[in-house]
UniProtKB/Swiss-Prot annotation:
PSII is composed of 1 copy each of membrane proteins PsbA, PsbB, PsbC, PsbD, PsbE, PsbF, PsbH, PsbI, PsbJ, PsbK, PsbL, PsbM, PsbT, PsbX, PsbY, PsbZ, Psb30/Ycf12, peripheral proteins PsbO, CyanoQ (PsbQ), PsbU, PsbV and a large number of cofactors. It forms dimeric complexes. GO terms for cellular component: photosystem II; plasma membrane-derived thylakoid membrane. The keyword Ligase does not apply. This is Photosystem II protein D1 2. The keyword Transmembrane helix applies. The gene is psbA3. It comes from Synechococcus sp. (strain CC9605).
């Protein structure tokens, strides 16, 4: 009987595979990391160069370039990587599609380069979270939670431009550009009156409240292991089996502060709730952006209440509508003479009275 003896020497490819998937590395790489690292590096390098030195971009496609970089007079607040031109629309616009590098810069090519590499990179980051959890035998909920901010980024950088028909409608990569995107989004889609946005606000602010409540309750019910002269933090040893705080005391305090059933008596269900609340809220916001991308907008109650003489009784909805029109006439002011809402025919008010029959 012959026995096949495998050579003890490892090939370079096998050594590389072992290194990539080794969970003992200081920072886990993983196969998703092989995709993530170059994509995020490319996005970061291009963003940094463009934010500092990119020439003005013809964002509206009307030969009126908008400057966004620092060396063209902006500061950290006003600077941005300007979205690609409306003349490009939804066309894929890599460097080799332009006649020259100057043309690529003029039409906002860096915006597409940054966004596409960034979206691939953060998607791979989510895959890397799952991959590391799988190799360590953990449950997969970390990457599920991360899918909420990932879906939000996908909504504003990919889905919304697709729905509107041009990457020039994507969110600019800067602080004031983000605020401009929010104002224009409200003007065109009435997002404040969309239920999914309301759920997102509840998720973000509720998550902040619950996080602060949980942290303060735990910190206030620590089991003292030190003297008064020492910090309580020294009473905890990493990996210790004993509870570091008294959950019964925290439960009793909060149950008496609100009422008994407002307080969790199960640590696992408590932490699931803390994770699920903001995640579900941000999921809803992403779905709201994605539906409004195709102009399924927020509720519109403009001029919906009339008196017996048919005169409009203004409500908060009418105040909001006037603010929307003001924001709409101010943006892209040279790209069109009138915003669509003002150029359209007079709208028929919805009255709160039954029509006359016969």
């Amino acid at each position: 009987m012959s026995t096949a003896i495998r050579s003890g020497r490892q090939s370079n490819w096998e050594a590389f595979c072992q290194w990539v998937t080794d969970t003992n590395n200081r920072i886990y790489v993983g196969w998703f990391g092989v995709l993530m690292i170059p994509c995020l590096l490319a996005a970061t390098i291009c963003f940094t160069i463009a934010f500092i030195a990119a020439p003005p971009v013809d964002i509206d496609g009307i030969r009126e370039p908008v400057a966004g970089s620092l060396i063209y007079g902006n500061n950290i607040i006003s600077g941005a990587v300007i979205p690609s031109s409306n003349a490009i629309g939804l066309h894929f616009y890599p460097i080799w599609e332009a006649a020259s590098l100057d043309e690529w810069l003029y039409n906002g090519g860096p915006y597409q380069l940054v966004c596409f590499h960034f979206l691939i990179g953060i998607s791979a980051y989510m895959g890397r979270q799952w991959e590391l959890s799988y190799r360590l035998g953990m449950r997969p909920w970390i990457c599920v939670a991360y899918s909420a901010p990932l879906s939000a980024a996908m909504a504003v950088f990919l889905v919304y431009p697709f729905g509107q028909g041009s990457f020039s409608d994507g969110m600019p990569l800067g602080i004031s550009g983000t605020f401009n995107f929010m104002l224009v989004f409200q003007a065109e889609h009435n997002i404040l009156m969309h239920p999914f946005h309301m759920l997102g606000v509840a998720g973000v602010f509720g998550g902040s409240l619950f996080s602060a409540m949980h942290g303060s309750l735990v910190t206030s019910s620590l089991v003292r292991e030190t003297t008064e002269a020492e910090s309580q933090n020294y009473g905890y040893k990493f990996g210790q089996e004993e509870e570091t705080y008294n959950i019964v005391a925290a439960h009793g305090y909060f149950g008496r502060l609100i009422f008994q059933y407002a307080s969790f008596n199960n640590s696992r269900s408590l932490h699931f709730f803390l994770g699920a609340w903001p995640v579900v809220g941000i999921w809803f916001t992403s779905m709201g952006i994605s539906t409004m991308a195709f102009n399924l907008n927020g509720f519109n109650f403009n001029q919906s209440i009339l008196d017996s003489q048919g005169r409009v009784l203004n409500t908060w909805a009418d105040v909001l509508n006037r603010a929307n029109l003001g924001m709409e006439v101010q943006h892209e002011r040279n790209a069109h003479n009138f915003p669509l809402d003002l150029a359209a025919a007079e709208s028929t008010p919805v009255a709160l009275q039954a029509p006359a029959i016969g």
